[in-house]
């Protein structure tokens, strides 16, 4: 029984070592694409921001305190 446990532990250790070697490549995430829409003075209108960005070929827009940012390219 004891040899069976030692053998099982050995197999788990070997499997873990092999998996660790295969996953040496660093994980990289693609950068989010954000494009500034036309500069608007004053407050940003969310509906207008979305509409302008969709017309330009993006998924939508996000209003910030200063301007509208288009997010996600459809192409």
UniProtKB/Swiss-Prot annotation:
Predominant location category: secreted
Source organism's superkingdom?
Eukaryota
Instruction: Say yes or no: keyword Ligase present.
Output: no
Residue ranges of the propeptide: 21-32
Which range is the signal sequence, renumbered to this chain? 1-20
The record's subcellular locations are: Secreted
Q: Which GO terms fall under biological process for this protein?
A: defense response to bacterium; innate immune response
Q: Which UniProt keywords apply?
A: Antibiotic, Antimicrobial, Cleavage on pair of basic residues, Defensin, Disulfide bond, Immunity, Innate immunity, Secreted, Signal
Cysteine pairs forming cystine bridges in this chain are 44-63, 49-68, 53-70
One GO cellular component term of this record is:
extracellular region
The task this protein performs is described as: Has antibacterial activity.
Q: Which family does it belong to?
A: Belongs to the invertebrate defensin family.
The protein depicted here goes by the name Defense protein 6
Give the originating organism: Lonomia obliqua
